[in-house]
Amino acid sequence: LADNKGRFYGLGRGTNKARIDYYREQLAQLGLGLEDKLHVKVGSLSGGQRQAMALLMSTMTPIEFLILDEHTAALDPKTAELIMELTDKIVKEKNLTTVMVTHNLRYAVEYGNRLIMMHQGHCVMDKAGKEKEDTSIDEILTMFNEISIECGN
C-alpha cells in the first residue's frame, strides 16, 4: 500500500518516514482504518477501501481534471455514500474539474454543477445552474424511460 512498487523486483522502499506519516494522515481522514494497513497488500482490502484509496491516490499529485467512471457502482450503499462524500470533499478542496459517469440518478442530481445525459453518443439532456438545481430524479427517469422505449428496451 505504501510505495511497495519496487519490492517485487528486489528494490528497497521508495519512501521515507515523512512520506509514510503523510500517507497515514491522508488515509486517517477516510475513517476506514487504512492508516493502520500501510503494510497490507492492496488486493486484500475490501472494494470500498480500494476505491477510497484509489481516489485519494489519484488526487495526491497536483491535477486539475478528474474523470470518475462509475466509481461507486460495485460498492454497498453505505460505502458508496462514504466514497461520494469523500469525492465531493476532495473535488471542492482541490477545485477540480470533474467528469463523473454514473447511473445513480440521485448522485446525478445531488452532486456537481452540470448534468448531461448521453444516448448513443449524443447529448439528450444538458442542465446547469438553476435549471440543474430544479431538476428532479423523476424528470431524469422520464427522459431515460423515453429513450429506452425508443430503443425497444
At which residue positions do the language-model features occur?
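Conserved ABC nucleotide-binding domain
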Residues: 26-43
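Conserved beta-strand-loop-alpha-helix hinge in the C-terminal portion
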Residues: 122-146
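Catalytic Walker B motif of ABC-type/P-loop ATPase nucleotide-binding domains
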Residues: 66-69
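H-loop/switch region of ABC-family ATPase nucleotide-binding domains
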Residues: 102-103
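A short, surface-exposed alpha-helical micro-motif characterized by mixed small hydrophobic
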Residues: 108-110
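Helical segment within the ABC ATPase nucleotide-binding domain
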Residues: 81-93
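A short, proline-enriched helix->beta-strand linker immediately N-terminal to the Walker B motif
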Residues: 59-64
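Helix N-cap at the start of a conserved alpha-helix in ABC-type nucleotide-binding domains
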Residues: 77-79
